């Protein structure tokens, strides 16, 4: 079983190489016309499987299409990776949409709304105290 340092090092190498493949080797208009970033790679302890989380500036429906296209192209990506890096076995890949940024923004929006509500309530209380 590989140690965490080795898994992190291999994940970093996979991220770098897959990014290069996405930028230079894939001939897909949907993928080329949208900014795609690999945010995280989760590699299994036995190095056989990896989940590749992507972020994009595109809308949710387009991001789903991007993930579908990437999953259709994963055989090509895996084959190209095998030619570029020395690994006993290139891991099976699954591409997923990383929604962490979206969730973080919605939490920030909720916090801002709560802050505004509290500010409005405090203003009403001050206004009522002045009338007394």
Swiss-Prot record:
Keyword check for Cytoplasm: yes
One MF term in the entry's GO annotations:
ribosomal small subunit binding
| Family matches, as Gene3D superfamilies | 3.30.300.20
Please verify whether the record's keywords include Cytoplasm.
Answer: yes
Task: Kindly list the biological process annotations in GO that this record carries.
Answer: maturation of SSU-rRNA
Among PANTHER family, the record links this protein to:
RIBOSOME-BINDING FACTOR A, CHLOROPLASTIC-RELATED
Q: What does this protein do?
A: One of several proteins that assist in the late maturation steps of the functional core of the 30S ribosomal subunit. Associates with free 30S ribosomal subunits (but not with 30S subunits that are part of 70S ribosomes or polysomes). Required for efficient processing of 16S rRNA. May interact with the 5'-terminal helix region of 16S rRNA.
Q: Quaternary structure per UniProt?
A: Monomer. Binds 30S ribosomal subunits, but not 50S ribosomal subunits or 70S ribosomes.
- What is stated as this protein's family in its record? Belongs to the RbfA family.
State what protein this is by name.
Answer: Ribosome-binding factor A
Give the originating organism. Prochlorococcus marinus subsp. pastoris (strain CCMP1986 / NIES-2087 / MED4)
């Amino acid at each position: 079983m590989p140690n965490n340092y080795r898994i992190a090092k291999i994940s970093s190498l996979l991220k770098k190489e897959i990014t290069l493949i996405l930028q230079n080797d894939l001939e897909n208009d949907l993928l080329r016309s949208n900014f795609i970033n690999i945010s995280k790679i989760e590699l299994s302890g036995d190095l056989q499987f990896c989940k590749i989380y992507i972020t994009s500036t595109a809308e949710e429906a387009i991001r789903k299409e991007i993930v579908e296209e990437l999953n259709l192209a994963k055989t090509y990506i895996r084959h190209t990776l095998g030619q570029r890096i020395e690994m006993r076995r290139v891991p099976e890949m699954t591409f997923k949409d990383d929604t962490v940024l979206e969730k973080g923004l919605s939490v920030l929006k909720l916090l801002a709304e709560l802050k505004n509500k509290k500010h409005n309530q405090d203003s009403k209380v001050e206004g009522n105290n002045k009338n007394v």
